[in-house]
Structures are given as C-alpha cells and as structure tokens.
C-alpha cells in the first residue's frame, strides 16, 4: 500500500510541477530519491552506551536499523582514533521515505519550539536539501522519559532536481514549511 504523500506526489504534484516548470516530458519532473538521517554522537568515544541509546532512537523514528559511522582519521584534540564509532545514519527509500517525510512535515516540525519554518538557503546547488534538528524528542516514537541526553540530527533530502529552484518547488508542493 502506498503512503499518503506518495499518492499526493503522483496524482497532484507531478502534473503541477510539469506545467509550472515547463518540462517537455513528464519524466523530467524532479522526485525525492532518498532521505539520509545522520546523528553524530561525539561522546560515544568515552561511553559506548550513549551510542547504543542513539542507535535505538534512530531505529524507532526511521523504522530500520541504522549503520554505525566510524572516524576516518585520528584526531588527538577530540581523543579520537581512526575506526572509532562516532555516529549513526539511516538511508530511507521508497515507502519508508515517504512515511518519514510525512511524519516530519506534519508531526515533528510543528512540535519544535519557536518554529518559523526551515531555511530556504539549505540547498546545496544540486537540488538536495539539508536541515538540522536540535532535539530528537519532537518525534512521537521517542519516549521523553527514556532519553538520556537530547541529541540533534541532520536530515538530507536527496532529489533528482538539477537546480535549487526545482528542488524548492518540489519540496514546497510536498508541504515543507519554509520560512517566510
């Protein structure tokens, strides 16, 4: 069964973007390819339990098992050795991607304190959008009482758009709340 956002994309957003951006083929209309959720856990070097807690939270809110990210270089300033676990990330595609994006737009972002919208300047020039979240407790799956420490995360939405303008139009139609 397709998610609500995927049905909206195919039935409503694709025809609107096709007309709005004057494409010659319906296949040129940009689509969301994947969403990458990255959580950096700097204090995982001293206490591995913090990494396990972050991994379980990431698994709850994404619906799949995260990959542990390891340090590429040794840095004495951070007491870090090459190969040490320093974070976790999840790549979402397909139905889970649409479900997560729907949850992010309609449930999580409105729960952020003093939320005025996500930045319009968070595009990378190639049609990808990245935003940061300061607290994981905005997601309903994360139990506030079991949270050891408030952690942030980076959410990257990778699209097939060639320019920032196309990606902005796509995400605006999807319902991403951009700042005024």
Curated annotation (Swiss-Prot):
One of its GO terms (biological process) is translation. It comes from Mycoplasma mycoides subsp. mycoides SC (strain CCUG 32753 / NCTC 10114 / PG1). The keyword RNA-binding applies. Gene3D superfamilies: 3.30.1440.10. Coiled coil: none annotated. This is one of the proteins that bind and probably mediate the attachment of the 5S RNA into the large ribosomal subunit, where it forms part of the central protuberance. In the 70S ribosome it contacts protein S13 of the 30S subunit (bridge B1b), connecting the 2 subunits; this bridge is implicated in subunit movement. Contacts the P site tRNA; the 5S rRNA and some of its associated proteins might help stabilize positioning of ribosome-bound tRNAs. This is Large ribosomal subunit protein uL5. Signal peptide: none annotated. InterPro entries: Ribosomal_uL5, Ribosomal_uL5_bac-type, Ribosomal_uL5_C, Ribosomal_uL5_CS, Ribosomal_uL5_dom_sf, Ribosomal_uL5_N. GO terms for molecular function: rRNA binding; structural constituent of ribosome; tRNA binding. Keywords: Ribonucleoprotein, Ribosomal protein, RNA-binding, rRNA-binding, tRNA-binding. Belongs to the universal ribosomal protein uL5 family. Part of the 50S ribosomal subunit; part of the 5S rRNA/L5/L18/L25 subcomplex. Contacts the 5S rRNA and the P site tRNA. Forms a bridge to the 30S subunit in the 70S ribosome.
